[in-house]
């Protein structure tokens, strides 16, 4: 912090509100200071012990650790905030408990999914200025930030988080809105699917707390097969793919072909009973909606981002699928940076610390004058 006359601005905050995880921290840092689940938990049972300081709601990791006695709710579904009261609790927790700052002193950069309803943006703006008294704020599209983080200005981003996946072609820093495609198939659907196929195997996972166990199994043991049919044969004929997992109560379960059947749903949504195209076809369709002159650059810059792209083997599989879809002479490159789980946040951190960005913030005075609709004018 420099305390010069012209530089009394506080460090901007960057808050990436995902459907599954909140990533929050300070602009200029290379990783988010706070990462916790976007969960609000409310007790399912009557409190009997007085004076324990039981709360009526728990947020994030605390909700996660007490999940056995709570009903867990995610206020963000498919990238869209569905419960604003809970969302406010999450932001409050972020500012006061995790980052320990006063939101009325620091400008705040928020992120949102592309093709989100306009009302969603306005409500975010309103809460920031009216509830938290932000001095300034900005709303940015997640995928654009991911590209910033990878150091490119042109490319197509496949951003797949917990609630929503989308493909966003960006050329020379401009998102091409007509070619953005959205797929409501992401980490949460994969977790639900894994719950279902584990149940077929005879293990029962039903409650919201058990879903978190399955999510952990998915993250620790899941992977993407290069050739699904071949992998299924291998799994059927040998035990080389089997792994064991210890449940919280000490019971050990074995998981075999479920390890790659789960992530396969990204490429074959029909597994989930969805009629949409897989992620590889969605990327291809998105590229084909762009002008013919920019396609070559997009094929050569396929950037993966978001937690659901963390499955081992996804880059190779993506390469293979894209090669079979694209024209035969086309050079195809899949970029999967190791920090892609947080690349959206990192991009926000880069953007908010640029000196040229200072003019972009929506200031409180502007909000007071124009109301929530200002967000559509100022934030592209």
Swiss-Prot record:
Disulfide bonds: none annotated. GO terms for cellular component: cytoplasm; cytoskeleton. The modification N-acetylaspartate is found at residue 3. Its main location: cytoplasm. It catalyses: ATP + H2O = ADP + phosphate + H(+). It holds the Pfam family Actin. It is found in: Cytoplasm, Cytoskeleton. Transmembrane segments: none annotated. Its EC number is 3.6.4.-. GO terms for molecular function: ATP binding; hydrolase activity. Actins are highly conserved proteins that are involved in various types of cell motility and are ubiquitously expressed in all eukaryotic cells. Belongs to the actin family. This is Actin, muscle. It comes from Branchiostoma lanceolatum (Common lancelet).
